[in-house]
Amino acid sequence: MKLLLLASLLSAAAALPIPLGQSGGSSSEQRFNLYPPQILPFFPQFPLPQAPLIPIPFPFPFDPNQVLTPNQLLALITSILNQLQGFLGR
């Protein structure tokens, strides 16, 4: 157990590089610079276009509390797929 604790402490100490060879006095800010410099992204960030809302007409009056029969469920799925097919241009 002690060996595992020692190994984890050594790996954590090795993971934090401390710059050496700085001329003049060094402040704690220079020695322990934990935050990387802020670099602007190479490609500009464009907002992604929002998908348009498509009104999907149901083939029958739909009550969310009613139980769908297999034929009604198939008709609903077919109607939705036909609407999406027309929107996607296939």
UniProtKB/Swiss-Prot annotation:
* Gene Ontology CC annotations of this record: extracellular region
Tissue specificity here reads:
Restricted to tooth and associated tissues. Localised to the junctional epithelium at the cell-tooth interface.
Which controlled-vocabulary keywords does the entry list?
A: Secreted, Signal
Signal peptide extent: 1-15
Where does the UniProt annotation locate this protein?
Secreted
| Top-level lineage group | Eukaryota
- What job does this protein perform? Tooth-associated epithelia protein that may participate in structuring the basal lamina at cell-tooth interface.
Q: What is this protein called?
A: Secretory calcium-binding phosphoprotein proline-glutamine-rich protein 1
Species annotation:
Rattus norvegicus
